[in-house]
Swiss-Prot record:
Gene: murI
Residues that hold substrate according to the record: 24-25, 56-57, 88-89, 200-201
Record protein name field: Glutamate racemase
Pathway(s) this gene product operates in, as recorded in its UniProt entry: Cell wall biogenesis; peptidoglycan biosynthesis
MF GO annotations: glutamate racemase activity
Any one GO BP annotation for this protein: regulation of cell shape
Task of the protein: Provides the (R)-glutamate required for cell wall biosynthesis.
Keyword field: Cell shape, Cell wall biogenesis/degradation, Isomerase, Peptidoglycan synthesis
Organism this protein belongs to: Deinococcus radiodurans (strain ATCC 13939 / DSM 20539 / JCM 16871 / CCUG 27074 / LMG 4051 / NBRC 15346 / NCIMB 9279 / VKM B-1422 / R1)
EC id: 5.1.1.3
Reactions performed catalytically: L-glutamate = D-glutamate
InterPro entries: Asp/Glu/hydantoin_racemase, Asp/Glu_race, Asp/Glu_racemase_AS_1, Asp/Glu_racemase_AS_2, Glu_race
Top EC category: isomerase
Pfam families reported for this sequence: Asp_Glu_race
Length: 290
């Protein structure tokens, strides 16, 4: 398949005026969106939630690559200047393929093992992730690069239940706390003092994690680092939008717009006490296919 060129987008606006595309399997990428809006408040964003196919974590490698490519192609078709793949599972399997196919910056997520290794005092770091992220190579690569030379033990915890709970609006619920207690108790017993949130849905579980484990773990995620990296990539490419303005966010979803709207009103990165997403009361949400 030939590369998809940025010039194929139908929007005639200058490249710097185009929005940043953000993609996730569902609502998890909203935690990354919140960081992008803090780091790049002047930028417009087009967010695509592939909620018809969430969760990605238990899907086959081929399915993950195909769904991710279709979603990114839809963002490119609508006209974006860069794409942030705000999904750890999609990043684990698709970044190389996406960068070969699409001629615009593709920014992915890397599990935040490096800062967790730097911060640990116990020498034990936990990683909470989906089966897909644990199956991919990105996590193994960063463990090999940062944890092993430092002599830090990395313990992995996996769940297929947490993403559906967040998507159902139950991030701060008894059901979520039961699952978290089961999967994280072995990490706490082993002395982990840092917990890498290896899925963009998981910052929304911070309140439930703290309710069960108090300050046992410092919670570490990639959102702020990805936002800084996006700003640097746009700056190097002359793609930063100038002017004193506040960017707008538009949303695409592959299933129920009303459900995504409800999640936008309730989800808070960092848990129940976190700041709400800085979105308008009635966000523009369009149903799409990929």
């Amino acid at each position: 398949m030939p590369p998809v060129s940025f010039a194929a987008a139908s929007d005639p606006a200058p490249r710097s005026a185009l929005p940043i595309g953000v993609f996730d399997s569902g609502a998890g990428g909203l935690s990354v969106l919140a960081e992008l809006q803090r780091a790049l408040p002047q930028e417009d964003v087009l967010y695509l939630a592939d909620t018809a196919h969430v969760p990605y974590g238990a899907r086959s490698d081929e399915d993950i690559r195909d769904l991710t490519a279709r979603a990114v192609a839809e963002l490119v078709r609508r006209g974006v200047k860069a794409v942030v793949v705000a999904c750890n599972t999609a990043s684990a399997f698709s970044l190389t393929h996406l960068r070969e196919r699409f001629e615009l910056p593709i920014i992915g997520l890397v599990p935040a093992v490096k800062p967790a290794v730097a911060a640990t005092k116990s020498g034990v770091v936990g990683v909470l992730a989906t089966p897909g992220t644990l199956r991919g190579t990105l996590l193994a690569d960063v463990i090999r690069q940062w944890a092993e030379p430092a002599g830090v033990r990395v313990m992995q915890a996996v769940s297929t239940e947490l993403v559906p709970l967040v998507e159902a609006g139950k991030a701060d619920s008894p059901e979520a706390r039961v699952v978290l207690r089961d999967v994280l108790e072995p990490l706490a017993e082993a002395g982990a003092d840092q917990l890498v949130l290896g899925c963009t849905h998981y910052p929304f579980l911070a309140g439930s994690i703290r309710a069960e484990f108090g300050d046992t773990f410092a919670l570490v995620d990639s959102g702020a680092a990805v936002a800084r990296h996006t700003r640097n990539v746009l700056s190097r490419g002359g793609l930063l939008r100038g002017g004193d303005r506040t960017g707008e966010v538009s949303y695409l979803t592959t299933s129920d717009p009303a459900h995504l709207r409800a999640l936008l009103m309730t989800l808070r990165p960092g848990g129940a006490d976190g700041a709400s997403l800085p979105d308008p009361p009635s966000p523009r949400i369009e149903l799409t296919t990929t």
